[in-house]
């Protein structure tokens, strides 16, 4: 049997990312063969990965990738989830998130297409994540994604609470169409992206807003106005005013720009168009906040201790 040296254990640990004791055991089981030990660890890890698949993955990273496309650009934002915030600082996980966002550029931007996309090494995104689950020991998944493309202009991006370049807890894309100067368009797009990160608008314009959301607010405002006991004509004007204020709060183009509340985002865009001497239009935006809508499991510490000591 080959001697299991510290150097061998270190090499296997660096290649696999697995703990030293597991590496030592793998080498012992495979007569010191590094490649066979890696396969052994993968097989061992994969058997555990299925058990981890039902754990809530509400942490992780939002990754962004951008590529020029003729006179325009395409960009993707991908939310890759893991179970703990600790993993988001892991180099392997960060590298995977970047690779996945890059692979998403060549897809239609749907989660199914992204998980089926192939990475540079030839394996699919899903296979890569499955192997990473085995290595790191946490459930991981591509939860949400978005892709924007403009034929002329830029897709600006912004990462809030960045862990590393193009990686963080909130990722925003803003598609800006124009034949104007790209540097100026990118500055405009980034400012709007920062605004979106801060205000979380529901839609780009009033026409894009879900009619059900408007009706819901209108019902609330109507009830409040009727309780005032004022004449019907006055009540109608009150409702109109409150709906207008609601739109100013949740519609991006109607919102007061956070960096200059004296103007709306729509006015900022018009001002930029005038300066550039070319039409400028915000085509759309996406805001991905890590773990948004995921119900995190609240562990019962006493029950956990009891189960570990066999007292449950």
Swiss-Prot record:
Its main location: cytoplasm. The keyword Glycosyltransferase does not apply. Transmembrane segments: none annotated. It is found in: Cytoplasm. The keyword Endoplasmic reticulum does not apply. GO terms for cellular component: cytoplasm. Belongs to the EF-Ts family. This is Elongation factor Ts. It comes from Caulobacter vibrioides (strain NA1000 / CB15N) (Caulobacter crescentus).
């Amino acid at each position: 049997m080959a001697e299991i040296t510290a150097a061998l254990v270190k090499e296997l640990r660096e290649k696999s990312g697995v703990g030293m004791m597991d590496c030592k055991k793998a080498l012992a089981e495979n007569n010191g063969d590094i490649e066979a030990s890696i396969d052994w660890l993968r097989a061992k890890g994969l058997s555990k990965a299925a058990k981890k698949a039902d754990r809530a993955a509400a942490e992780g990273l939002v990754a962004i990738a951008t590529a020029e496309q003729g006179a325009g650009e395409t960009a993707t934002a991908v939310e890759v989830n893991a179970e703990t915030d600790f993993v988001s600082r892991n180099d392997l996980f960060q590298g995977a998130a970047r690779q996945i966002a890059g692979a998403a550029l060549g897809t239609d931007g749907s989660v199914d297409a992204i998980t089926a996309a192939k990475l540079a090494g030839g394996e699919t995104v899903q296979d890569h994540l499955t192997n990473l689950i085995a290595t790191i020991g946490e459930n991981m998944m591509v939860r949400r994604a978005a892709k924007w493309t403009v034929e002329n202009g830029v897709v600006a991006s912004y990462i809030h609470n960045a862990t590393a370049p193009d990686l963080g807890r909130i990722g925003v894309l803003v598609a800006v169409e124009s034949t104007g100067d790209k540097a100026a368009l990118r500055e405009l797009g980034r400012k709007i992206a920062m605004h979106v990160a801060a205000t979380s608008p529901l839609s780009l314009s009033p026409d894009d807003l879900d009619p059900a959301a408007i009706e819901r607010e209108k019902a609330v405002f109507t009830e409040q106005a009727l309780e005032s006991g004022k004449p019907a004509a006055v009540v109608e004007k009150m409702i109109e005013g409150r709906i207008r204020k609601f739109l100013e709060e949740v519609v991006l183009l109607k919102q007061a720009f956070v960096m200059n509340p004296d103007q709306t985002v729509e006015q900022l865009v018009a001002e930029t168009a005038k300066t550039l001497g070319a039409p400028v239009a915000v085509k759309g935006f996406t805001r991905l906040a890590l773990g948004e809508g995921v119900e995190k499991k609240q562990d019962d510490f006493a029950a956990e201790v009891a189960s570990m000591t066999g007292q449950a």
